[in-house]
Amino acid sequence: MNFIHDYRSPRVIFGPDSLARLPQELERLGIDRALVLTTPEQAPLGRQVAEPVIGHVAAFYDGATMHVPALVAEEACKIARTSEANGVIAIGGGSTIGLAKIVALRTELPIVAVPTTYAGSEMTSIFGITEGGVKKTGRDARVMPRAVIYEPRLTLELPLSISVTSAINAIAHAVEGLYAPDATPLLTIMAQEGIAATVRAISRMYQSPRDLQARGDALYGAWLCASVLGNVSMALHHKLCHTLGGTLDLPHAQTHTVVLPHALAYNARAVPDAMRVLRIALGHDDPPTALYELARDNGAPVALRDLGMREEDIEHVGDLALQDRYPNPRELDRDALLALLRDAYHGRPPSA
């Protein structure tokens, strides 16, 4: 056994009523002029969350949107500078926290993240920005939030359809972490626990969307899964999803949900150790099929065509995904990759 374990993580405050810690976290970080970021849809929630610290808010910006368009990032950074903000409070999911990361990258302001989905961006130093139909990603320690407040009550109003796909998106982070070249024994344990907790939570949320315990378990699983991704390299699954999202503007979590079973099936024979862990975590002898059925049986999409992709886009997406080399356990083959995309486009069960 050989590994180098260099764990990177923000400070985490977790549990019901943990939002009460927001004033203390701002004080700890010396933030007294915060820029509050949300999407347009979550602007009212953002103001509600920020109300107890309104005296320490310099400005609100509610323009966050999927895949962090460059123009949106420029606007948010301009507001951060003109308002003389000395910190960022990001209230929302991957779109909002992703925008906060670009603001932090360009201004070096500290982030306090308050997630309202299970996307997990808050636990990584990964950032992305989209310009000219291309989503560029990278890693930088400056974009890692300084504190993350996981308040399960904030997810109770998250629509069920988004809850399921967001949770499967979280699972995708841990799945790829299991076969990353820089995986470690501790990250493997975290991935197994995170996947198992999230799968249990999905079934319970689907039956009872306002089950606070299930919502808490989903956040717990998302925290673990994202923590894994924050400490490993990304492979085929994430590359495909970033390409589909940045090029075709497909919805982030739904795209992860559709692609994950197929990307795992593509790599399955090359990662026997990861497959053993997944069989335990998923309680199923065939992990790709288990993930496909998890989505299908809980009302989530299983076909890229249902997300707005056109069949004629398949070859273009495949070629883009092959342009940049990245670590993947199985060699990338154009014909096999296009077959994967066709299966995902039509919503067929995954095949190796």
From Swiss-Prot:
InterPro entries linked: ADH_Fe/GldA (IPR001670), ADH_Fe_C (IPR056798), Alcohol_dehydrogenase_Fe (IPR039697), MAR (IPR034786)
Any one GO biological process: catabolic process
Catalyses which reaction(s): 3-oxoadipate + NAD(+) = maleylacetate + NADH + H(+); 3-oxoadipate + NADP(+) = maleylacetate + NADPH + H(+)
Known EC number: 1.3.1.32
Top EC class, one word: oxidoreductase
Functional pathway: Aromatic compound metabolism; 3-chlorocatechol degradation
Gene3D superfamilies to which the protein is assigned, alphabetical: 3.40.50.1970, Dehydroquinate synthase-like - alpha domain (1.20.1090.10)
Gene Ontology MF annotations: alcohol dehydrogenase (NAD+) activity; maleylacetate reductase activity; metal ion binding
UniProt keyword terms in alphabetical order: Aromatic hydrocarbons catabolism, NAD, Oxidoreductase, Plasmid
Superkingdom in the source lineage: Bacteria
Family: Belongs to the iron-containing alcohol dehydrogenase family.
UniProt-recorded name of the protein: Maleylacetate reductase
Source organism: Pseudomonas knackmussii (strain DSM 6978 / CCUG 54928 / LMG 23759 / B13)
